């Protein structure tokens, strides 16, 4: 098993390394045809922003105020605030820098409770459009991970909360590493593979182990009027807490996009062995969601998550139900503004000590440009 994983890692690493090393010379070898227009190498830079804001009522559980009264917690929050700086040095070299402004929650920190500035993305990108399919590239630095970024492009309600696999702690949206992306010809799908520190963007590397991730997506009927939005995705992540202490995630996903509805189903299998002496935990779960849409901006959101966190404790389950109504304001281009009124109910079964139901009602707002 270890020999097989080592072979996979060597092949994946070789692919990424060759892509990165070959980018510059391959681009230099391409000579535009006599009648073609040379690519635009004018340096460009643009600045954008993303804001997630909400007003949330925590109906359950109640909280106790300073006088010992049991009260319903209500709060205005800024869940996320990004400043996106993107640009091109030439038509083949691009970059992105995205600081993330979020609330510090570390106990004992001098800024506990304050909004703090940290780095979410900072990477260089080599575009291979000159000699590969359009949309092929390699990245180096702190960047989006293959699965979360892909799924957030289909499930548009990140401003309500993270996708199932990230919310349950199995994946992160960003990590430091190198990756390669390739679009299949004729819009049949794409492949995104990379090697990462594995500690996510919120922590430094702590040992010699790396996380190897690969996502492959197939669009079986790209020419069909009604089924071109159907995609089947497989994802695998093999990392280690330490040598021989596996941290593995496998996901099978089916998604569908249409003018009037987006929908998806994910099945997750995750294994963790925290250290040599610890038993391996085996988690299994799934999520299903649908977002019916109208042509006048109104959308619905319905989502159900289920996770069995450890096969050795079969009575333990976590479930979450999300339902809401959203209005997406009409804009030109890639600008997005939306308001979402939603209900979020999480239950916990079989845990010791027992955990209370967490029920939230909220108004979420999104601004992205």
Predicted regions span which residues?
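N-terminal periplasmic/intermembrane-space "pro-region" immediately following the signal or transit peptide
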Residues: 1-66, 111, 369
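Outer membrane beta-barrel
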Residues: 33-60, 70-201, 206-213, 217-226, ...
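C-terminal hydrophobic structural anchor segments
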Residues: 295-344
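A generic beta-sheet turn/junction motif
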Residues: 184-186, 256-260, 295, 332, ...
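Outer-membrane beta-barrel "beta-signal"
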Residues: 214-216, 323-329, 355-369
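Extracytoplasmic loops and strand-loop junctions of Gram-negative outer membrane beta-barrel proteins
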Residues: 64-69, 159-164, 235-238, 272-274, ...
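Detector for outer-membrane/organellar transmembrane beta-barrel domains
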Residues: 40, 209, 217-310, 319-320
């Amino acid at each position: 098993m270890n020999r097989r994983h080592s072979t996979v890692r060597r092949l994946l690493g070789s692919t990424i390394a060759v892509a990165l090393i070959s980018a510059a010379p391959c681009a230099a070898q391409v000579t535009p045809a006599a009648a073609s227009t040379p690519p635009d190498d004018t340096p460009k830079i643009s600045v954008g922003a993303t804001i997630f804001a909400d007003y949330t009522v925590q109906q359950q559980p109640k909280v106790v105020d300073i006088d010992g009264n049991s009260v319903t917690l209500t709060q205005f929050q800024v869940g996320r605030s990004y400043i996106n700086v993107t640009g091109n040095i030439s038509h083949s070299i691009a970059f992105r820098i995205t600081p993330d402004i979020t609330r510090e929650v570390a106990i004992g920190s001098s800024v506990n409770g304050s909004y703090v500035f940290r780095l979410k993305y900072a990477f260089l990108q080599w575009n291979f459009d000159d000699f590969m399919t359009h949309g092929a590239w390699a990245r180096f630095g702190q960047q989006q991970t293959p699965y979360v970024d892909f799924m957030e492009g289909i499930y548009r309600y990140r401003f309500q909360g993270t996708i199932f696999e990230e919310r349950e702690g199995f994946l992160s949206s960003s990590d430091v590493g190198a990756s390669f992306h390739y679009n299949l010809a004729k819009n049949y799908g794409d492949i995104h593979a990379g090697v990462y520190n594995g500690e996510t963007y919120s922590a430094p590397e702590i040992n010699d182990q790396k996380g190897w991730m690969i996502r492959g997506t197939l669009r079986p009927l790209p020419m069909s009027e009604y089924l071109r939005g159907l995609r089947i995705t497989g994802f695998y992540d093999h990392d280690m807490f330490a040598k021989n202490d596996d941290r593995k995630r496998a996901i099978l996903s089916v998604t569908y996009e249409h003018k009037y509805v987006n929908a998806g189903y994910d099945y997750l299998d995750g294994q963790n062995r925290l250290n040599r002496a610890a038993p391996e935990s085996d988690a299994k779960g799934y999520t299903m969601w649908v977002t019916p849409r109208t042509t006048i901006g109104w959308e619905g959101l319905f989502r159900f998550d289920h996770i069995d966190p450890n096969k050795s404790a079969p009575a333990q389950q976590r479930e979450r139900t999300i339902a809401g109504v959203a209005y997406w304001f009409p804009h030109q281009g890639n600008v997005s503004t939306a308001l979402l009124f939603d209900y979020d109910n999480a239950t916990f079964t079989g845990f010791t000590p027992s955990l209370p139901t967490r029920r939230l009602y909220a108004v979420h707002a999104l601004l992205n440009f």
